[in-house]
């Protein structure tokens, strides 16, 4: 007897709605040519880590709750005396999400977290890098539903990078719009 495998809601949405729409819009000959979302990288830089390294551990724990997987502690590559930073000192945490976790995170980001951001007027449509990847910043990590607001010691910001297989920014923008990313007009 074969076990039933779990498929995220956005993955089936991509297969049934987004892919045919993209083929129609851009005239792809091969369905494998249609851009997909490759990975999502979430990075938390902790500036106060130079004074107290416990803050990196706290930020990493919050990031693990948000992403659903254990983050990697990022370390300083070289010493910078003006920032009181030594080489190999912990300065933040990052997580790379792929496959099911990526789609689940993207669903929570678009439907729950972004609407909870204060004074949110839409994502900047100019934040593409020229190669089909999109980067955005979130000033407060408490917009995610996994974070218990009462237990938060400090509010951290984070960078979220959505890497796609799109060749151009126009294709990537159409892909993310199809996934209901709220871009500014």
Swiss-Prot record:
Annotated GO MF terms: rRNA binding; structural constituent of ribosome; tRNA binding
S-S pairs: none
Pfam families: Ribosomal_L5, Ribosomal_L5_C
Keywords on record: Ribonucleoprotein, Ribosomal protein, RNA-binding, rRNA-binding, tRNA-binding
Record-level GO BP terms: translation
GO annotation, cellular component aspect: ribonucleoprotein complex; ribosome
Source species, domain of life: Bacteria
Family recorded in the similarity comment: Belongs to the universal ribosomal protein uL5 family.
Function: This is one of the proteins that bind and probably mediate the attachment of the 5S RNA into the large ribosomal subunit, where it forms part of the central protuberance. In the 70S ribosome it contacts protein S13 of the 30S subunit (bridge B1b), connecting the 2 subunits; this bridge is implicated in subunit movement. Contacts the P site tRNA; the 5S rRNA and some of its associated proteins might help stabilize positioning of ribosome-bound tRNAs.
Subunit structure: Part of the 50S ribosomal subunit; part of the 5S rRNA/L5/L18/L25 subcomplex. Contacts the 5S rRNA and the P site tRNA. Forms a bridge to the 30S subunit in the 70S ribosome.
Protein's UniProt name: Large ribosomal subunit protein uL5
Organism of origin: Xanthobacter autotrophicus (strain ATCC BAA-1158 / Py2)
Gene name per UniProt: rplE
